[in-house]
Structure formats: C-alpha cells, structure tokens
Regions:
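Conserved short submotifs of the Hanks-type protein kinase catalytic core
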Residues: 118-131
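C-terminal intrinsically disordered, low-complexity extensions immediately downstream
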Residues: 357, 361-408
C-alpha cells in the first residue's frame, strides 16, 4: 500500500468559503476554494484537487489557472464522559486509512486541521459535484446510457478492488457515499468516500461484531450481517455493491426494508423479507454454514410464516435489458448478490467479467463523456444556505459560521 504525505496546514485562512453544502449531527460541510497563493501549494501536494470551471486542457502559457475547489468538513466535538472529544474513533480511523489510500477512485484527503480553541476538526477533501444518489434520482427524468451505467459500475469495482487489496473493508457502501466529479477533465470519475466505518480486516484479533455490532446501512446490508455473523469478510462490500448496481440499472433501491425503530439488533426481519421475496429463501444446502449463524432460527420461523420463492426472481425485479449484454449483467449482479459469502464474486473477479471485458460499450474512467456523444450534464449540488451572497461568505470565517457567530 502506497503512503501519501499529508501536509500540516497553516490553517483554514488559506481557503475562501463559497457556501455551505451540508449539515448533520457530525457538523457541517462547506464548498471552498484556495486563495491564489495557496492553489499552487495545494496542487503540488497532491493530484487530487478539483479545478473550478476546468474545460479540459492544461492552462496555456501566461494564462492563470482556475482556483482549486475543495469540500471542507468541520467535525463537532462530542462528549465522552465529562470531556469534550473532537477525534472520535471513527474519525481517527478515517484519517488514518485515507492517509494510506491513494487511488483515482478513492476520495483524497488533502489537509487536517484541529482548532484547540473551537474544539473542532477540519478535514479538507477534494470536491465532487454529485454523489451517486443524486445521479440515480436524476436518471428517472434523464435515463443513463449503457455506457454511463457500465462506466460508473466499473469504477466502483476498481475502487473496491484497490481497498480490498489494501486489506480495507468499507462497511458502509451506499450511493450517498460514492461521489462523482461533474466537471472538468475528470467528469464522471467515481470516488469512494466516507470511511468512518472502514477498518483493516487482516487477521482480526477478535470478532468484528465485538467492535461494531451493526455496520452497513440497512438497504445495503449483507444477509450474513442480518443473521449476526460474528466474523465476516470483504464480501459484505460486494453485496452492497450488487445492491448499488441494481439501483443504477433500475433507478430505485432494490431492497427497501423498514428498520425496527430504536433497535440496534443486527436481525431485521422486514429487510430479510424484502431480500427473500426477490432472491428466494436460502437453505443450508445453498448457503453452507448458515444454520450455525445466531439468527438462523428466525429464518426458519419466517419460512413457516409465509411462502417464499424457491428460485431467484431477480430477473423480474431488475431491468437488465435484452440480448447478450442483459444476460451478462444479470449474471454479474446475481453473483454479487450470492447468499453464501464464500461463493460471492470478488471485486477482482467482477472486473474481469464478460460484461466489462467482452461486450460493448467499453467502460471508461469518465462516465459522463461517452465517445462520439454529447456530454451528459446533471444538476450540480446546491448550497444549503442560498440567501447569502458570495461577498457575505468571503467576509466570514469557517469557525464563525460553525459556532453561530454569523454577521447579519
């Protein structure tokens, strides 16, 4: 695994706020650009920066380069006992992993800055205009071409394969955690993001379920996790990727179960019900060892309560299309949604699947720029706060906005 140096920043005064693009219990996310004096330094520290309004070629001699654009995540402190803690275990893990990971299809972490006075942590990432969820939602009005779908899928697999080769499980693969660059030379480039639940999995000292009992967002959670497997593998990421691929094809989620409110239990009956209705009921004959999983008796009871298909109905649930391409895509996603994690296809194997290697169109790294076609355009990310002018944002600091010390 190649290590990339992480510069110690002088502070966030090198960045100008363009707007706030997100807010949650974790804190806030801002879109920002580096001031001219900082752009060159940021560019030389990494190739992961995003140029604003980049039209494709490098700047001509004597021509000014556009400022680099970033997403800056300000993380709130939280209580652990009587102390205010800025660096949660998830944040520390994300920083450590992203310092080590270096791949075109994994989001790049440029800077880390801690403000002791504000008790706040700032993470400076490369900026992407969309997440995959945005693209899927917009595809209902603007259907994606076969080229765009295939190129998105292929890049996701490249990112997952790189992670797994580095002994990293993501454990929260979902469309919202997959970013897509929307402009410039990297239009349509995929970036796996949000590594807060990711972890190294080589030779774990203890059962992974002892560390975090529930991982992966419900709709993308593998059946072995729902049955409370104490030890699980990178195959959980491949199940999630299979759900995501079906979503790209269909324009909607595949398994939309309802989580028991307030429950932290791995077993979620409604989610398994949604899976069984599409893929059929697994048995110890088709999934070796499932009878030893803690929640297997619940599956037996579900089989007594209602009749599930004995064979997969996936062909009826996903619009695979006709011909050789449709059959190959069905085979690929079926192998990603294999119940038995030991039989589930790996990212490396999936990259060599005939759907990508033998059937046109050939997938590329720029999913929005299909050769010989007009470039695809999508609505870009909007700011959460829309009534502030650019001049207003320029006059305030990140910390002022974050702490509520905003000028009128």
């Amino acid at each position: 695994m190649r290590r990339t140096a992480l510069r110690r920043p002088e502070g966030l005064d090198r960045y100008r706020i363009l707007g706030k693009i997100g807010e949650g219990t974790y804190g806030m996310v801002f879109k920002a650009e580096a001031y001219a004096s900082s752009s060159a330094a940021a560019s030389s520290s990494s190739s992961g920066g995003t140029k604003a309004k980049d039209s494709g070629g490098s700047a001509a001699a004597g021509e000014e380069e556009e400022p680099m654009v970033f997403a800056i995540k300000l993380v709130k402190s939280h209580k652990e006992g009587k102390n205010d803690v800025v660096l949660s275990s998830a944040t520390v893990r994300e920083i450590k992993l992203l310092r080590e990971l270096n791949h075109d299809n994994v989001v790049h972490l440029h800077d880390v800055h801690v403000d002791p006075r504000e008790k706040t942590l700032a993470l400076v990432f490369e900026y992407a205009d969309h997440d995959l969820h945005d693209i899927v939602v917009q595809s209902k009005q603007k259907p994606l071409s076969e080229y765009t779908k295939k190129s998105l899928m292929y890049q996701i697999l490249k990112g997952v394969d790189y992670m797994h080769d580095a002994w990293v499980m993501h454990r929260d693969m979902k469309p919202q955690n997959i970013l897509v660059v929307g402009h410039g030379r990297k239009r349509g480039q995929v970036k796996l993001a949000d590594f807060g639940l990711a972890r190294l999995y080589k030779e774990p000292i203890k059962a992974l379920s002892d560390v975090e009992r529930v991982v992966v967002t419900l709709w993308y959670r593998a059946p072995e996790l729902l049955l409370d497997a104490k030890h699980y593998t990178k195959a959980v990421d491949m199940w999630a990727a299979g759900c995501i691929f079906a979503e790209i094809v269909n324009g909607r989620e595949l398994f939309c179960g309802k989580e028991v409110e307030g429950s932290k239990a791995p077993f979620q009956k409604d989610q398994l019900d949604k899976i069984f209705k599409v893929l059929g009921m697994p048995t110890p004959q088709t999934w070796e060892g499932m009878e030893h999983l803690p929640e297997y008796p619940q599956v037996v009871q579900m089989g007594r309560e209602r009749k599930y298909p004995t064979q997969s109905e996936l062909k009826n649930a996903v619009k695979f299309g006709a011909g050789r391409s449709g059959m190959a895509l069905y085979d690929l996603i079926s192998r990603m949604l294999e119940y038995d994690p030991e039989k589930r296809i790996t990212a490396k194997e999936a990259l060599e699947h005939e759907y990508f290697k033998q059937i046109e169109p050939e997938p590329r790294d720029w999913a929005f720029d299909e050769p010989g076609k007009e470039p695809v355009a999508f609505r870009t990310q909007t700011f959460v706060v829309t009534w502030r002018t650019t001049e207003w944002w320029s006059a305030v600091s990140f910390w002022d906005v974050f702490a509520g010390r905003e000028p009128p």
